[in-house]
Design a protein with these regions (language model features):
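Conserved AMP-binding/adenylation subdomain of ANL enzymes
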Residues: 166-193, 203-220
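Carrier-protein-dependent adenylate-forming modules in NRPS/ANL systems
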Residues: 1-174, 186-187
Length: 220
């Protein structure tokens, strides 16, 4: 059956290669099984928030495996994510959050201080705390079934060099089609170990994340 939601990449790979490393960083590695569990636990928490239905959720981003888990957790809830560089000035963070009207801000223990400065913008959700919840798979499935392939996966903001940063919406279909084309054109397989070359708030990172998840490959 053709895919229409990129969240299915992680689910299918976790079912096929559960114990394989999905993403790794200086702090360690996360398997497909663990990433799916933590993403679904986060998705369950987000799905319980008011107005969190096919809505924007900000993710405080570093170049870590946990950041990928957080992004996938947002998708599991049926929402879409807005990457926020943890090192950008607070004024820029507030500008982005104000434009998208984020329903929540997901953060990790590593960037909690930056997130706490934004508590007046949206509720904070800790990835580590959310991962302790039991995933409600039926709820998440129902939420994702509402999503069309023209709905957003994420919104990236431009540098703002010409004024106010502007949001660029990336839909599910764009990622599904591009990932399928890249796999065919380059002959990628699940044996690949990709190198993450771009920060997750930059468009090129989508290739690193979704090529990996779609194949059941690994990224370091």
């Amino acid at each position: 059956m053709p895919l229409r939601n990129v969240a299915e990449y992680l689910e299918r790979s976790a079912a096929r290669v559960p114990d394989k490393t999905a993403f790794s960083d200086a702090a360690g590695a996360v398997s497909y099984r663990q990433m799916l569990h933590d993403a679904q636990a986060l998705g369950t928490v987000l799905a319980g928030l008011p107005g969190c239905r096919n809505a924007p959720v900000a993710v405080m981003i570093g170049r870590t495996a946990a950041s990928v888990t957080a992004m996938q957790g947002v998708l599991q809830s049926g929402c879409y994510y807005v990457p926020i560089d943890e090192q950008m000035p607070e004024a820029r963070m507030r500008s982005i959050l104000g434009q998208v009207h984020a329903r929540a801000i997901v953060h990790t223990a590593a960037n909690e201080p930056q997130a706490r400065a934004l508590t007046d913008c949206a509720p904070l959700v800790s990835l580590e705390e959310a991962s302790q919840h039991t995933p409600d798979e039926a709820l998440l499935r129902a939420r994702r079934e509402e999503i069309l392939d023209i709905d957003p996966v994420y919104v990236l903001f431009t540098s703002g060099s010409t004024g106010t940063p502007k949001g660029i919406v990336i839909p599910h279909r764009a990622i599904l089609d591009f990932t399928a084309w890249m796999t065919e054109f380059c002959g990628y397989t699940e044996d690949e170990v990709f190198g993450n070359q771009a920060p997750f708030y930059f468009d090129l990172s989508g290739k690193d994340v979704y090529q990996t998840l779609s194949l059941g490959a690994s990224t370091a």
